[in-house]
Amino acid sequence: MFLSFGLVLFHLAGTWSLPLIDRDEPRFAEASREMIQRADYVVPYFNNQLRLDKPPLAYWAQVASYRIFGESDFSARFPSAIAAALVALVIFAWSRCNGATSVGWWAAIIFTLSLQTFVHAKAAVADMWLVLFMTLAHWSGYELLSRSSRGTARQMPVRLGPVKPYHQTRWWLTFYLSLAFGFLAKGPIAWSPLLTVGATIILARDWQLARHLKLLRGILLTLAVVALWGIPALVQTHGLFLAIGIGRHVISRSLVTMEGHGASSFGMYLLLLPFYFVTIFVSFFPWSIKLPWLIRQLCRQKKAGIADPGYGRNQLDNYLLTGIAIIFVIFTLVATKLPHYTLPAFPLLALLLARHWQGATAITNHGSLFRKVAITSACLGLAIALIIPPAVARFFPAYQLFRESRPNLQPNMQFASVEFEEPSVVWYFRSRVQSFLNRVNKKNAVDFMSGPGPRFVIVPTSLVQTLFPNPPQTWTSFRTRGFNIAKGNQVDLTLVLKSE
């Protein structure tokens, strides 16, 4: 209980003072709000338009958070913090279940304090839910294999007693249900633990293990759970969820670069193949400083024929390495590349590093180094989370315009924007305005403001005098300067408001 509470508090630090970052965070947050407004929890919408990029589990979690805390930046991010804390608890429980509680503590700390976890545990996106269910699937898949192997003559774990059918069924259900919920979090990549389990069986050449997976029944269970949402979603969207969600955002993303993230040519694709093997040293920081040591340690043990440390002859190292390799290979081959795509491998990597690092403390002073790195990272993380967000909030243009104009906003207002259409505009202003954002060009902006009823438009400040040279005295304007993170450029915006 103490561990889980501390993890949640660590991840939540600063989430209330940093505005949502364009573009993904406001899209998720607003789509969840529109689920509530539309009373439709099957098909997500953003700004009254279908949003078919991701399955619904992250939206459902945010909806639950909104019900508890209300709609805010904090409540949009709260589910990710919970998911990240649960991942650490799963790693801890996995290790403790295998008789190594101290390794579990180390692994949970390593995962929690890695840079990519620090970022995404505070982000209003779906990634941490994917990581959670993939980690659960990897753990339960491992338990299925290791416990099933007690019926064979080789690789029989010495730590375990007789297998109870109840336990075997529990791990079987956990494995296939985790695959289902992982899919509902972020799509087919959640099924990669199937590849890990399959590859482990092939490498072990123990074909009797495959029988205990009950693969056909398990896949049917997974598909049945997904179908409870998927069939209504396909019916409501006339198949668009499959065409866009899988066709565009899975298949096309794998074959071609999307949104400028990745290679623009085949030559660049080849050049970027080592992308994740380089970015891991940033994403997994500060623990990446020990990765070269871990590689040398694994190589020495393989050459010496030393069995896995701590767990007898259960080959956990091989299982963890297989899972890590599969995730890295999949995303290495995918054309679209972002540093956080390999985040599902981090729990496995944290457990692998903790097993060997903690084991080495018996003959070295590495334990002292671990404590120093952990304490320093935790203190720096808290300082950054609590100090930086309030200092940079003024550079978020949509957030600042909303704060300044909030007393003048009315629920029945219409609103539009010219040349600044970031999702944060929709998220912040729709918390006070019931209508949806209209995207207009310079010519239509004047016509829009000439319409009946209260309304406002957001335009670049350089266009204000051209578009509205002689505004009525009853009109109000608000100006802000900031930084468009999505496009990487500075902006100077003015909100022109007509109250009646």
Give the ranges of each region predicted by the language model.
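Short periplasmic/luminal acceptor-recognition loop of GT-C membrane glycosyltransferases, typified by
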Residues: 381-491, 497
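Membrane-integral, polyisoprenol-dependent glycosyltransferases
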Residues: 1-358, 426, 483-492
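Hydrophobic alpha-helical targeting segments used for export or membrane insertion
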Residues: 1-12, 378, 382-390
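Signature aromatic-anchored transmembrane alpha helix within multi-pass, membrane-resident enzymes
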Residues: 305, 358-386
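Extended hydrophobic-aromatic, low-complexity segments
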Residues: 339-342, 353-354, 363, 369-370, ...
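A membrane-periplasm/extracellular boundary helix in multi-pass inner-membrane enzymes
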Residues: 234-238, 373, 388-389
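Hydrophobic alpha-helix feature that most strongly marks membrane-spanning transmembrane helices
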Residues: 330, 334, 346-349, 353, ...
